[in-house]
Amino acid sequence: MQHPHGVQPWGNFLLNGGADIRSTGLGQLRVLSDDLLLTVLGLLPAKVLLSCSATSKALYCFCNHEELWRALTLQEFEGSFRYSGSWQHTYLAAAGLTEPGSQPSCGPLKVQGLYSDILYQPWFCATTPIREEWLERDNLERRSGLSLEDFRQHFELPNRPVVLSDAAKDWPAQKKWTRKYLRKAFKGQAVVAGNYPMAFDDFLAYSDGATDDMPLYLFDCEFAAKAPKLATDYKVPEYFAEDLFGVLGESARPHHRWLIMGPPRSGSSFHKDPNATSAWNAVVRGSKKWILFPPHITPPGVHASADGADVATPVSLVEWLLNFYDAAQRGGVRPLEGVVRAGEVLFVPRGWWHFAINLEETVAVTQNYVSSAGLPAVLAFLKTGRADLVSGCAEADRADLHERFVSALREQRPQVLESC
């Protein structure tokens, strides 16, 4: 496949030579790096950006870069848009500059002689097929019919991941949660996708048409309040029934459960779960590829600050797979990885780095929790008093979360507090 504007990676110029239209096409802007040029263009309003795109073939390619129009759309309209095949056309329709649902009168202009990794790479990551070698390795332990004691002794206490292959297979959600059912459940409600409130039908339209290298995906911690019947369609697996944050009450505890839905290639880049909690993730429809590293091994390509407050990762999940998956296999500690499918539940222990990419449109439920086994780690984390590291609750409630949690435990679960 060829980039829609004919842009090629910089390596092609180094290998093959030929004309380079960048310098002549950018004029005095040629002194700027591609990255800095896009930053400058990102400061322009849409109409100026369109005018600039008509000045030269080189600027045409930069000004039509999809990431610029995605940023403009989300900045100006947040989630109030209907995706229309490209981010530029989506913006123009949302701004009333074109008719909603109309198609561009002509296709994209293809140029020759423009070489830019920053323009080429997002398109390449969005269109390159998911490779079989990224999926074939499966060394996650899988168990069915596991007793509570076996789970505790073999997985929870040693802090080891496991796929519980039958933990969600009998949920009503497995049969109920079709698009039609979810559309009805969320009627009149906005869901959260990419941190923006969006009508559920608009999210589905985006999901069907998105060509992003890192697609937006639905990640909503208030789904049960917005669509109460969804909360009755699943049951917390017995292995995770103890959740000590519950002593704070639903309104005072950190956010702990989310509905997740997204198109292929959407998902979450490497991170550790908040507040030193453990988590479980149940796939209702679709499938997810998971990669996990133990707490003391930072994944290749990931750069974390000493306190964990800041984590830098590649922009897209496919970019990490392209650039770092092979390196991960050659490292001293290989990751645990595998595909989790509908009806299966992955236990993600506290502190583990994890990455998940949807292989198809996928719907899942995930919850973070604090068990007796995990309580010492959570209390130690909260005791630091670092409000900037606490997440899932109002900023004003973060600094004293440790104090409030201990007080509630002392009143409601004193034996657990004494034994930790």
Regions found by a protein language model. Give the residues of each.
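N-terminal accessory scaffold of Fe(II)-dependent oxygenases
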Residues: Q2-L38, G42-V345, F355-C420
